[in-house]
């Protein structure tokens, strides 16, 4: 019986089960050759589905490889460097015209300067950017009639700036500054044209072409470390920027106070100069009067009489003679007193 059972042909169900057990496992990767494909079994629908899936995966793998090859070819193409400012080179700012009138402030800037100092006094623990944000929010919510006050002041300041600028443009200082600015602009253009006209050395050009492009694959530890370093650098730059803004605000306030102090000192200097000129005129008139009144009073022991040029020396010598010989100089003293009484009258 056992031999008979083993010799009997297998049924269709046994054939399907045996085929499933002996068939190759499902496709787990991308195959580029057709030799590893499973044989075709028309009586097994499961194998047909597996072969279709394998063929689809194979085609998609070939397409991916083709696309990756195209990407490699594109990456291997030399990348031309865009024109622009040279890395690491700083732009030079044009020198400021110190003689020019002060630029006008807008209404918002006036409100911000006034309100910012109040907030820094009331809330010293709040950082500078937060104060700026609070001031901006208050300005947007400020009523129109209160906001109009700052806008009117800004308009007056603008009119003042326009008048002062028109007056300044007619001065020699502005003409000198304008000529210097034009000469600097011409020199800069000539330097740029000279740099463009000089051919690049072939050796330097080959070095630039062979220089590797900084490329880090994503989803790697190196990329994460690079991102962390950049984020730390950005945080440090933001912190430095905030500190510089606060320092700039403090320096701006100090500059304004220094300007007001300079203006006050200039006004005091003008007053003192006017007072000095008046005193100089009065002194000159006193010298003339003394010279005229003391023409007949010589210094004791000499025949020297005063003149307009020697009146100061004459008065000094006369005083020394009177103090040295007071008894002999009583007549001269009485005469000088009469002259001075007439002068005071």
UniProtKB/Swiss-Prot annotation:
Coiled-coil spans in chain: 227-290
GO CC terms in record: nucleus
First and last residue of the signal peptide: none
Any one Gene Ontology molecular-function term assigned to this protein's record: DNA binding
Domain of life: Eukaryota
Biased composition (Basic and acidic residues): 112-124
Pfam families associated with the record: HMG_box (PF00505)
Places the protein is found: Nucleus
Keywords, in A-Z order: Coiled coil, DNA-binding, Nucleus, Transcription, Transcription regulation
Main localization, broad class: nucleus
Annotated SUPFAM superfamilies: HMG-box
DNA-binding stretch(es), residue numbering of this chain: 101-169
Biased amino acid composition, Basic residues: 80-94
Alphabetized SMART domains for the sequence: HMG (SM00398)
Biased composition (Polar residues): 32-48, 57-67, 167-180
Spans annotated as Disordered: 1-124, 167-198
Job of this protein: Plays a role in neuronal differentiation.
Identification of the protein by name: High mobility group protein 20A
Organism: Xenopus tropicalis (Western clawed frog)
Organism lineage: Eukaryota, Metazoa, Chordata, Craniata, Vertebrata
